[in-house]
C-alpha cells in the first residue's frame, strides 16, 4: 500500500515539474465524446489542433477492447500537438451488495465448487457488500516511427488478498504493437465476447476469465478471419501422492485460436481454441523428472440474432486444464496419481459449457439476460472418492439499466449446485445488486 501511494506521489511530482500546460478541447466522435487536453511545452496555452484531437480520439476508439468485464472508453485524453503520444487515466467504481439464502457459498464470488456439502447454521444465509472490484487503469497510445501504433495498458483492482482486505492487485500490464502482446493480460484461451455481462464478478462457472503472463501474436483479416498464437506462464495444481513431487515448470502453455467474424458490422463471431500443456513433475521412485501432457479444445462465440437479441456460448473439453475452467481453477486435478498403480501419474478429463441469451429492451440502455452453465470432472482408474467434486451448475438471470452513459444499476439472481461423486448434492441462492460508475 505504501508503494502504491508513493508511486502516485512520484507521478504527481513529475507531472508538476515539467514546464507545460494543458489546453482542453471537448471532442465529439459519434457517441464517444471525451475531453481532449493538449500538452504544450514552454508554458504557452494552446487550444490545440483539431486534427490532432481527432487522431487521438481515433487511436483510443480503434484500440478499445469490448467484452466481459471490459471498461468503457476514457472520458479524458491527454495528447501532444502532433498526437504522437496520448495518455488516458480512468477507472470503474463498483459496489455489489449480495444476499445468500437457501444455502450460502463460501466465496465472495458465486462459485459452485465452493458450495458447502453439509448444511449448518453457518451456511444458511449471508449478506455482503463489496467494492474490491473497483479498478483504476492507465492507457497510452504511441504512434511510433518504427513500431507503428503502440498500446501500453495497465490496470489494478483491490482483490490482492483475503476477502474484504482491499489489497491492490495488478490485473494486467502489457504492451501491444504489430499484432504482438507482451506482458500480463487475459488468457488467450478466453473469448471475451462469448459471455454476457453478469453482476457476479466471476461469471459462469464454465467460462475462463483469468489473467496470465504471455507473449501472443494476433492477426485479423479484412474478410473477418483471424487467428492467434501464444506462449503463457504455466500453473499446475496437482495431487502427487507419495511417489511424485512438484517441480518448477519448464515449458509454457501453448494456446492458439482461429476466429471468424460475421453479421452486421461483424458483431457476431465463432472461435475455435486449443491449449497444450507439458506439465513437469518428479518421480520419487525413479529419481528423475517426468511430464504429463494436458490439452483442451473450446468452441465459443456470440451471435447477434437481431439488434434486440444476442446469444452467447462456449464449450470446453480436455484433460489437465483446471486453469482454463473457472469452477475448477486452483483445484488439485491437473495431475493425480493412479490409485490402481501408484507408480503412475495421470491427468483427469474435465469439461464445461455455458449458453446465455440477452434481450435488449432499449439497446445500450436497458437489457435483460439469462443463462445456464455447467462444469464436470471425469473419473479415471477410480481416483475420485465419494466426497470429491463431480459436477457444478450455475444459473443466472439479470437486468442492467444505464441511468446515464456512465452510471449503471443492475439486479441479478443466481442459483448454483454442487454434486459429489456419491451423488450427494447441495445448492445455494444469491441476490446481487450493483451500482457502477465508469470514469
Where are these regions (language model features)?
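Transmembrane beta-strand segments that form the barrel wall of outer-membrane beta-barrel proteins
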Residues: 149-160, 227-233, 273-278, 367-380, ...
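Residues that define the transmembrane beta-barrel architecture of outer-membrane proteins
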Residues: 85, 125-134, 167-171, 176, ...
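Outer-membrane beta-barrel translocator domains and adjoining extracellular loop/strand segments
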Residues: 103-108, 163-170, 193-200, 238-246, ...
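Outer membrane beta-barrel
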Residues: 80-109, 121-237, 255, 259-261, ...
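Outer-membrane beta-barrel "beta-signal"
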Residues: 26, 427-439
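Detector for outer-membrane/organellar transmembrane beta-barrel domains
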Residues: 261-384, 389
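Repeated loop/turn-to-beta-strand initiation elements of outer-membrane beta-barrel proteins
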Residues: 146-147, 179-186, 223-227, 265-270, ...
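N-terminal periplasmic/intermembrane-space "pro-region" immediately following the signal or transit peptide
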Residues: 6, 13, 20-101
